[in-house]
Structure formats: structure tokens, C-alpha cells
Amino acid sequence: YGYDYIELWGGRPHAYAPDLKAGDINEVRRLIEKYEMPVLGYTPEHNAYPYNYMIGSEAQRRDAIDYLKLSLEMAKEMGAEFVLTSPANGGYLATYDQLWSRLEKNIQELGDYAAKLEIKLVVEALTPYESNFFTRANDLVELFRRVDNPYVVGMCDIVPPFVQHESIMAYFDKLGNKMDHMHIIDGENGSDTHLIPGEGNIPIKEMLYEMKRIGYDKTATLELVTNYINEPRFYAKRAIDNMRELMAEAGIV
């Protein structure tokens, strides 16, 4: 379909980090070489089960951190530039002080390991349907105030700001050179559903025009997630075709 690169999701039976370590990484590298398609980033599943570093006992937190360290290692082996992490729901009894203390500890450790491997750790804010405390650009700003590490950077999935009536473009101003990646998809009010670009309510063409105006030159991927799992090839093709058309209309070649 003409992709420049892909962002690889990891969860069984699909690029799960322990399976990669057990030998599946060789198949991933074979496919990268066969199709001449680099893996830009690796996104291991850890928002709910069985891994979520924001909730549970210390043993459970440690297990999640070790899993993500392994994910960083596997990303490095496949030639990826980053691993994506998103702080999920921290439980309903935790205070903000407790949540922030736990998150700072987690990202500090993962960031130090990312720096050791010389691979970026990209942190993503989620929708309020997915996380009960890390959902806005300001949360990323606060995290970067607490964790000073050039290998820890941020991104914008454009659905979270849209469903919260937050400015998408504010991410660029607030994060500055820490604004390193984007998930560009469409969405609708009242839902965290990710839709094919041009088939929801987000003014993507106008957003692309503004991105061109400010000179955004980092990376972006189309994250369709679970809404189209019945026919992923059909909808992946439609998504990239729609995106090319929107980019052309915005004057991006």
C-alpha cells in the first residue's frame, strides 16, 4: 500500500515480546528484509491485562516493568527507533500523589534503560475512557518536568484531545522538541473509537494544514486498532488512501 514504515503492536499471537525473545524476532527481521519495510516503533500491549504498571502490588508493577524492558530490547533488535508506553488506569482508590509517584518511578527506570540501549521511550496520553489520570498534554509536560531524560519523549494521538475538547495543536506548543510522534486517525465525540481518516468528526485536513504551517517534521502512523479487525487489509488500504487525499488537499506532498 506504499507505507514508509510501520508501527508494530505486540500482543499474542502478534509480536509479543517474550515470544520474540524466544525466537520470533528472527521472523520479524526476515519480514522487514523481505518487504523492505522498516519497523519505526514497537508498541507492546500493556494498558490492561496482563500488564499495567499503574496498578496492583509491587510484584505486579515489577513484572510489568521487566516486560517493558524486554520490549525495549526486542525493539532495538528489530531496528525500531522507539517503544511506545501509555500510562493506563491507576485504580479508583489511588490519589493523584500516589499515581504520580508511581508513574515517575516507572518512567525514570524505563527511561534509564532506554538511554542505555539508545532507543527512545515515547509516552502517550490516553482518553479518559482508558486512563483515569494521564490524559492531556499538561500531563506530559508535568512528566517531563519530573523526568529529565532526552530519550523520554512525548506524542499526540489526536483522539484523546478531540474527545476532551482539548486543542490538538497545543501539544506542539507545550511539548516543543519533546513532541516526537503522532497517531493520526479520526474519531467521534463521546467515544475512544479510532476511525479511518476522513470518516469521523475530526477536521484532519485543517490539522494537516496547520502541521505544515508550523513545520512539523517528526513521524506519524495510522492507528486503526480494533474497529476493523474483521477485514484489516480492506480498511488499511482505505485508511492510507484517504490520508494521502487529505494530505494532498492540505498541500502536503
Regions found by a protein language model. Give the residues of each.
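Active-site acidic/histidine proton-transfer and metal-coordination neighborhood
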Residues: Y51-V153, V163-H165, V253
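Glycine/Thr-rich phosphate-binding loops of Rossmann-like dinucleotide-binding domains
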Residues: Y16, L93, S131, D192, ...
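Short, flexible segments with low predicted structural confidence
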Residues: Y3-D4, H46-A48, T85-S86, A114, ...
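N-terminal pre-domain/capping segments
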Residues: Y1-A80, Q108, A115, N149, ...
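Histidine-acidic metal/acid-base catalytic patches
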Residues: Y1-G2, N26-R29, E33, G79, ...
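Active-site-proximal loop/turn and secondary-structure-junction residues that shape catalytic pockets
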Residues: G10-R12, E45-A48, A88-G91, A125-Y129, ...
